[in-house]
């Protein structure tokens, strides 16, 4: 299932946080992708708890993940707070962090 998880993660790179201009994977917003025989559960967080684009971004994550797998997809909001240290190194470099 590792290949499937990677495939879903790669698809989620198309989902952009428009306030920052980078994808949700590079920003570290996708915290977990769990798969079993018929389901995918994606746990994500936002850069800000008051993000006005929260529902839009969750819908985008759901759509892209659903396009990359035949399984039922659920997207849930994680409880942890986002921190720039969660970003991939290249994303931090792009933003000068």
Give the residues covered by each predicted segment.
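Domain-level signature for proteins that mediate thiol-based redox and metal-cofactor handling
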Residues: 1-97
């Amino acid at each position: 299932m590792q290949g499937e998880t990677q495939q879903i993660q790669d698809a989620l790179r198309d989902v952009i946080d428009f306030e920052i201009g980078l994808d949700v994977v590079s920003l570290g917003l996708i915290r977990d992708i769990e798969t079993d025989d018929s389901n995918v559960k994606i746990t994500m967080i936002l850069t800000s708890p008051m993000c006005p684009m929260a529902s839009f971004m969750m819908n985008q994550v759901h759509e892209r993940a659903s396009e990359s797998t035949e399984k039922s997809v659920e997207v849930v909001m994680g409880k942890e707070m986002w921190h720039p240290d969660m970003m991939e190194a290249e994303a931090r470099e792009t933003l000068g962090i």
